[in-house]
Design a protein with these regions (language model features):
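Conserved nucleotide-cofactor-binding alpha/beta core module
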Residues: 81-201
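Class I SAM-dependent transferase core
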Residues: 1-89, 97-101, 105, 118-121, ...
Length: 221
């Protein structure tokens, strides 16, 4: 990741262009677009990718992980429907960019990362930024039972199923956005899952995506 946290006029200009590109791609939630405009994506990338930081593409961040393309971050965040003050659980901290977008929107963000090296690298970056994110090294399938319940849960990796432990940690009326492995095993379908009053789940599908797999346990890659 980039150790230079400078955010200059050029970076801000590129972010404005990115926001307009996302608007053209169908992102309509102004709170999401404002957050994308506020969070400096280039600081989460390796210095060799800084010049490309505001293009709509994913980049490797080490430990076999990627930073999702901005349109995917914006799409998932828009589906989540975050309101200021909500408790949001993120599974897969990765670079920390998605967590900062959520924090910029006023969410109380709790984020789990399973890759030890990536966890500490990202934690160091986050501590130098103005966005408040609580990070945890752990297994995303288990969630954070001691911090439950959550208003929103966002998963940033492809999951084979909806983890039962995470459902238990959702408030009634809470929403989970999760990329679920499709039947062919060649990608994911984006699901919006709402927990109803009787405890059942309402599931809505929102198109095909490609994510790294959601893995169990703590990794040392």
């Amino acid at each position: 990741m980039n150790t230079n946290l400078e955010d200059n006029y050029r970076h801000k200009g590129l972010r404005k262009q990115l926001v307009e590109a996302l608007r053209a791609k169908g992102i309509t939630d102004e709170a999401v677009l404002t957050a994308i405009n506020e969070v400096p994506r280039h600081v989460f990338l390796d210095s060799s990718f800084v010049e490309l930081a505001y293009q709509d593409q994913a980049f490797p961040i080490g430990s076999g992980q990627t930073i999702s393309q901005p349109s995917t971050v914006a799409f998932q965040t828009q589906l989540l429907g975050v309101v200021k003050g909500m408790k949001v659980l993120e599974i897969g901290t990765g670079s920390g960019y998605q967590a900062c977008v959520l924090a910029s929107m006023g969410a109380k963000v709790f984020s789990i990362e399973r890759q030890r090296n990536l966890f500490f690298k990202t934690k160091e970056i986050l501590e130098r930024l103005p966005f408040r994110v609580k990070t945890f090294l752990g297994d995303g399938y288990e969630g954070l039972p001691s911090y439950q319940p959550f208003d929103r849960i966002i998963i940033t990796a492809g999951a084979p199923n909806i983890p039962p432990a995470l459902v238990e940690q959702m408030k009634t009326g809470a929403v989970m956005v999760i990329p679920m492995d499709n039947a062919e095993g060649k990608g994911q379908i984006m699901l919006k899952v709402t927990k109803l009053e009787d405890g059942t789940l309402k599931k809505e599908e929102f198109g095909d995506f490609k994510f790294v797999p959601m893995l169990k346990d703590i990794g040392n890659d």
